[in-house]
Amino acid sequence: MAERRPSGLERSPTAPPVLSNGHFASIGAEGDASSYEHGVQVIDENKEFNPDLSKYLSLENVTPAGFNYHLISVFGSQSTGKSTLLNHLFGTQFSVMSELERRQTTKGIWLSNNKKQGDAGSAERMADNILVMDVEGTDGRERGEDQDFERKSALFALATSEVLIVNIWEHQVGLYQGANMGLLKTVFEVNLQLFLKDKHTTHRSLLFFVIRDFIGTTPLKNLQKTLLEDLSRLWDTISKPAGLEKSTIHDYFDFQFYGLPHKGYQPDQFVTEANKLGLRFREGHRDPKRDALKGEFSEGGVFLPEYHRRIPADGFSHYAEGIWDQIVNNKDLDLPTQQELLAQFRCDEILREVMIGFDEAITAFEDKQAESVRVGAPEVLGGLGVAMRAARVKTLKSFETEASRYHKGVYQRKSAELQGKVDTRLKALFHGQLSAAHKSGIRDFSDSVSAAVKDGQKKGGSYDFAEIVAKETQSSLEKFEEVAHSTLVDGASWSNCTQELSLFKKELAEVSARLRRDEMRRLATRVERWVQSRLGESVGLEFNALGSGRAGGGAPENGEKPTEKDFWDRIWNLFEETVLDAERRFTDRASSFDASIDEVDVGLWRLRRKSWGVLRAKIEEEMIEGNLLLKLRENFEDKFRYDEAGVPRIWRPTDDIEGIYTRARESTLTVIPLLSRFRLERTTAPPPLDRWIGHTPSTATPADEEDLAPIGGVDEHEGKSLEEEMTILSDAKRQELTVRFKKAADGVYVEAKRSAIGGMTQVPLYFYGLLLALGWNEIWAVLRNPAYFILLFAFAIGAYITYQLNLWGPMLKMTEAASQQALEEGKRRLREFLESSDTGRQAIAMSAGERAGSSGRKEEYEMSDMQKRASNANDDLDDM
């Protein structure tokens, strides 16, 4: 019987004046645990959801049940005994209709826990934690044509419940409205949209038709056949989404049918059958031998695993509220999404909780690593691996314990998300640790090798570079592997140091190769300096000896001394011998570096190119215009001033100065074209520089070539031929050099000519006759006197010998020099005497006035004298 509710001041504004299920906890009612003893209102008639649903579940000890609970809903027409049926099946105390008033009793949706647990020792007992929802009936006069709540409540029941009990009377079978076919059609249409949201899982529900007032006249099988046919036709008429046109109702729903006797006419049978029906609400399994399409249904437990919505009990309240919010706001209901939202809500909460502990364990390491990277000094963190492994295991295990009961897909996704977050941070730490170990290892390796090399050099320069590299490489690898293995995290796919170890080995090899190249560069530099020193000496000697008759250049070809024709052959042979010796030195030393054949080839190739550059630079140094002109003059003077025996010539008027000059000049001029091009005498062609240097090795890097000067005939891209590379003097330089040499040679010739003319005394012929006439007596006196005669004879012999030895010129020059020196010495002594005596000082003062007057005349005289001398010199040159 319905009771009157409290006054308006005491009840909720949304509560009706007549109390329905007044002994239940309704929405807006406040009370203690006793008010939830019989159940709770989930949704009121105004479509308001009860936020205290979770409180009721906690009081009934359902919240910690996890998945060990079941939800049943009942719907059907109003006043058909739905609440009565639930009370008999589950021992609940839902309010029932007053038979005297025939009005609506259940308003909204109410929920109660199963009060019938059955015998614990019985083989057949009801399942634990059965939650029963009593849904407001349809087709009531109170709602009239407003079927909105009917559809929403039915959809809510279908979306949340495993089993939907459809309560109908036997005489309503075959009817459309009486059998709630219109409502089922709407539910089916919307439900198809729900199933489309999750194509990986087909959610099934059980529609349990309880046929009331079953008298048995029409067999139950015929009734269920009629209902199935109606449901199938109803299914065929609904609009199906794309891809589900050929689907059947059995793809989404299972069906059970049970007939109950008339409660008023057969009360005992009704109670008995209701008890039997109640025992059906237990866990069961699908019987593969029964075909639902043929009307064969299992009579065992109705709670099949596929019916469960897999919503943990502690999240059901939040899930149901979300479902109702979707329904009441006329949004497309998406059950998988709602389940995912619930799971996401709970998993997010759990995730945040477990991440707090993770942060406490890891953040300090992250900060320290970030700081070391910021300052540019990566540091290997001690104890990182232990902390990472412990934090990961604890975090993932805690999340699994709390969140694994929720929607599998969401749990897996959130678990993957958590694992992703954890692994992302741990992976960053892991790679940061390996990066620090990598960088510090490379740095330490390079420093250790350099230190060992320097130590070896200090001890005497004898060290095995390859042995040093191998030792330090092994040490670096052991340190890196120790750090990497101590940082590995079990179970993490990214926790693998194989790639990093491979990269570390690769970079060690690259650094080793770079250090080896640097060491070989230093070796090459030392060898190049040695080549430069050797070539500088030997080539300098050849150029110094160029064309010197005394040194052999001007000697005949069949003589013991080399000729000028094979000058470049000697230079090239010296060059080849020197470089070959340098290559042996380089190869022998490079073998201790464990250098590859390719590296040695590159080193030798560079050495040959560098050596040619040294030779070319030395030749250019020797061939500087001033140096070359001096060498040509020396060459000319050696041939002009000295005879074939190397004796200096004393020019006499009778000597063939012009012939000797011409031969010496022409011989020297032949040296200029010889020196202008580097050609071998034996082949009359430039040396095979391109073959001697060889092709660029395939392993040569741009760094190996960047400091090399281009060589004509070898580097084709330079556009310079071998002939151009071997050209030492251009045509213009040759012509200029020839002109300048001829001028210098002419000067030497003029000097020689003057020397010959200056030694000749011009005595008139009549002087000899006058001398004979006037000195006849003296001549006879000398001839008759033996002493005079002997003295004259000795003087004549001395003069003859002097003449034959061509010593008159030197003797005259010596005499002139001695007399000049005596004159200068006399002038000096006279000046000292005049300055030291009074008489001398007075004489100097008297001559000072006269000197000023005569200065003009003196300058005029000196200028005239200079012009006269210049005119005489030009006349002498014209005469020669």
From Swiss-Prot:
Topological domains, Lumenal: 784-786
CDD domains (UniProt xref): GBP (cd01851)
Bilayer topology annotation: Multi-pass membrane protein
Gene3D superfamilies noted in UniProt: P-loop containing nucleotide triphosphate hydrolases
Superkingdom of this protein's organism: Eukaryota
Keywords of the record: Coiled coil, Endoplasmic reticulum, GTP-binding, Hydrolase, Membrane, Nucleotide-binding, Transmembrane, Transmembrane helix
Residue positions binding GTP: 76-83
Record domain GB1/RHD3-type G: where: 66-320
UniProt-annotated location(s): Endoplasmic reticulum membrane
A GO cellular-component term linked to this record: endoplasmic reticulum membrane
Function: Cooperates with the reticulon proteins and tubule-shaping DP1 family proteins to generate and maintain the structure of the tubular endoplasmic reticulum network. Has GTPase activity, which is required for its function in ER organization.
PANTHER family associated with the record: PROTEIN SEY1
HAMAP family, alphabetized: Sey1 (MF_03109)
UniProt family annotation: Belongs to the TRAFAC class dynamin-like GTPase superfamily. GB1/RHD3 GTPase family. RHD3 subfamily.
Protein name: Protein sey1
Organism name: Penicillium rubens (strain ATCC 28089 / DSM 1075 / NRRL 1951 / Wisconsin 54-1255)
